[in-house]
Amino acid sequence: MEAMAVFSGSNLFATSSLLLTTNSKTRYSQLRTTQNLSAFSSKSHLFSPSSTSSSYPKTFRTRSSTESGIFLPRLITSLEQVDQAYIMVKPDGVQRGLVGEIISRFEKKGFKLTGLKLFQCSKELAEEHYKHLNQKSFFPKLIEYITSGPVVSMAWEGVGVVPSARKLIGATDPLQAEPGTIRGDFAVQTGRNIIHGSDSPENGEREIALWFKEGELCEWTPVQEPWLRE
């Protein structure tokens, strides 16, 4: 026991010195590791200007002429003419429950609905709408048909809405209308051809002004608009 105590005592100072040296190296290694892990300030962000080394000069990137050309199609698209079309579901289309189907086809095409109402058309309004046909032998029968029940008046808006609407609707004579068109799919006779659509942008504006009063149209922006055109 005494021998062991003497041996331990003789080496006590050396052992203590070794432990102190080892602990110092460990703390120094931990300190360097912590400093390396803390390269970014706690208040900084990897993508913020403060995270950029001050030894590198800051530069500002300007758009080149070749890059600006990418946006030219968008500029052209923004200048495209947005037209209006008046679409009316006639009494037979309303009675047959085709209003939803017709609206769906125009919506799926990407056009914007700005006016919609269901009402009973008066004789005076029908005669004004079809005044270009007042010399035709079928005119009285046409007026009787349009006023025989409620109609659904719609105002649609979009680039090329008038010619596109005519294609969606189909030929006046349902027997000549292509399959896939509204008249081609749902009508069989000219006297019951379900739907009316403006035949020109000018008539579209005129008919909308005739069938809708001031304040009845709604101006809005569909969320799908950026996905319709470049």
UniProtKB/Swiss-Prot annotation:
Cross-referenced InterPro entries: NDK-like_dom, NDK-like_dom_sf, Nucleoside_diP_kinase, Nucleoside_diP_kinase_AS
Ligand binding (ATP): 90, 138, 166, 172, 183, 193
A GO CC annotation given for this chain: chloroplast
SMART domains for the chain: NDK
Record-level Gene Ontology MF annotations: ATP binding; metal ion binding; nucleoside diphosphate kinase activity
E.C. number(s) listed in UniProt: 2.7.4.6
CDD domains, sorted: NDPk_I
Active site: 196 (pros-phosphohistidine intermediate)
A Gene Ontology biological process term: GTP biosynthetic process
UniProt transit peptide range: 1-64
Any Pfam family the entry gives: NDK
UniProt keyword list: ATP-binding, Chloroplast, Kinase, Magnesium, Metal-binding, Nucleotide metabolism, Nucleotide-binding, Phosphoprotein, Plastid, Transferase, Transit peptide
Record flagged with keyword DNA-binding: no
Compartment list: Plastid, Chloroplast
Co-factor(s): Mg(2+)
Annotated catalysed reactions: a 2'-deoxyribonucleoside 5'-diphosphate + ATP = a 2'-deoxyribonucleoside 5'-triphosphate + ADP; a ribonucleoside 5'-diphosphate + ATP = a ribonucleoside 5'-triphosphate + ADP
Keyword Transcription regulation attributed: no
Coiled-coil positions: none
Family, as annotated: Belongs to the NDK family.
NCBIfam families linked: PRK00668.1
Function: Major role in the synthesis of nucleoside triphosphates other than ATP. The ATP gamma phosphate is transferred to the NDP beta phosphate via a ping-pong mechanism, using a phosphorylated active-site intermediate.
Protein name per UniProt: Nucleoside diphosphate kinase 2, chloroplastic
Organism in which the protein naturally occurs: Pisum sativum
Gene: NDPK2
